[in-house]
């Protein structure tokens, strides 16, 4: 069995880790970074960039660079209006009212884009481990719905990974924190403020058991929103100064986003920062530059409501766990946004002066925890048990559009529960089971997960038929619902996979397409390497021709020029196969070897001629040397004659 990797698939950055020698370690990407931007860029020629390379070209290719795709995965069109307005790339309605992105006339699902990021992480892990990677544990925000969890799992499948487990991000961070502290009984609160989501989880640690007591959160709160506040402030100020609305310029908007993120990071360690964006736009009077000063106090004023929004989920989680702030032993910070001083101060104030524990890296803790869980599943870690919970209540719609809960939130998973229902009208022969997730009283206010029909119920008076509805949640938090007529034994079930209309066949098709694209990426990389080799050989040939052209025979020059023409032709042919390119390269290299041999042979012949001339009485200085850069043989003349004086030497201290 190969290594199982742990992946933190984040909104703004992703990270991959593996267990080595019983300890989790982060795997650096091919660019040397320990985290990889969750960004995918599409070039004009069809090339696809992922991670740091995609981020570098985002300003000049804003409409074809996809970021924050995690905010769309497994969500409906009508639920994402705010997110769609923020991004420069095109969003279109997918099947079943989901959100797809449109790039150069082609639609991609969020699962496909996420799979491209996962493929990059998978490739980096394979390069590090030196072996193929086929299995992974992937983390999701604790407050992800069933549809979002299933969509994330589909993304892993498309990327060519068998997703052994989906675990919650705060739970993974707790694993990273508590791996070496399993003998200590303690209650910890994980405060996870990432790029796009916010989660709070309370866990009890002890005797190798990590038990989640309660979880709460907000899937629409994260670092992106903090950046957005700064962007809005810059747009407003620039409009006041220059009477130009930068919100209408997608390239300018992308520059503003990058500047806002940079300013936010700098203000975590500085009292103020300068924002300078030359040539941000232009009008009839000429180019315009953006120059602003942003103080930490002003930043905290801009994001005050967002910081306040982190308090209620903590109150809710403590209430659900029947705990008070003083009962918490450790507070763990996870996610880059927890570095913001105002966030930390709000947390310290809420816990009456208790400072958070800083023993884990906020950017890497989740991936490290995922690697630990991967080690558990791979048999590398013993005596560790993870007991997670379902973050939201699950149930069905009943008479009067009421949401009837079957599994309450914060129930430990895996779990299964059932409840008996009956018909609402006389003679009813079928019932529609409408499955919902949420906490509101009315069905319409909760998240719809799916519907199915149980037909063939014998006609009877209302309230007589007995229909048992069973809910089963697996270890990944993914739901299966069944309904059975107790009178006839007739049964119908559904596994909730309504994550954007992706059937099993479609997921498999996308996986095969991703493999083809990965192969195409590999081919492009090898093609670039071959072109670089060809460029080097052409430079060597030109240098040889310049320095030793008179020593190269005309016949071999003609042959070499033919090979040069062939090389130049294949370098400009995008359809050339790697095998053909390599063959042309090998042929040209052999020609260069022949030229080298020819140069040395002629140089030696010319040197022999010079020696003959010198034996006729000529001085070596009388001979012109047209050869530059060629080797001259070493001459061993015997100078011991009558005019040579022999001397003894004595060393003097």
UniProtKB/Swiss-Prot annotation:
Aminoacyl-tRNA synthetase as UniProt keyword: no
Keyword Nucleotide-binding assigned: yes
Modified positions (Phosphothreonine) in chain numbering: 197
Keywords attached to this entry: ATP-binding, Chaperone, Nucleotide-binding, Phosphoprotein, Stress response
InterPro entries: ATPase_NBD, Chaperone_DnaK, Heat_shock_70_CS, HSP70_C_sf, HSP70_peptide-bd_sf, Hsp_70_fam
Cross-referenced CDD domains: ASKHA_NBD_HSP70_DnaK-like
Induction (UniProt): By stress conditions e.g. heat shock.
UniProt GO MF annotations: ATP binding; ATP-dependent protein folding chaperone; unfolded protein binding
Transmembrane parts of this sequence: none
Pfam families on file: HSP70
UniProt cross-references to SUPFAM superfamilies, sorted A to Z: Actin-like ATPase domain (SSF53067), Heat shock protein 70kD (HSP70), peptide-binding domain (SSF100920)
Role, per record: Acts as a chaperone.
Assigned protein family: Belongs to the heat shock protein 70 family.
Record-given protein name: Chaperone protein dnaK3
UniProt lineage: Bacteria, Bacillati, Cyanobacteriota, Cyanophyceae, Nostocales
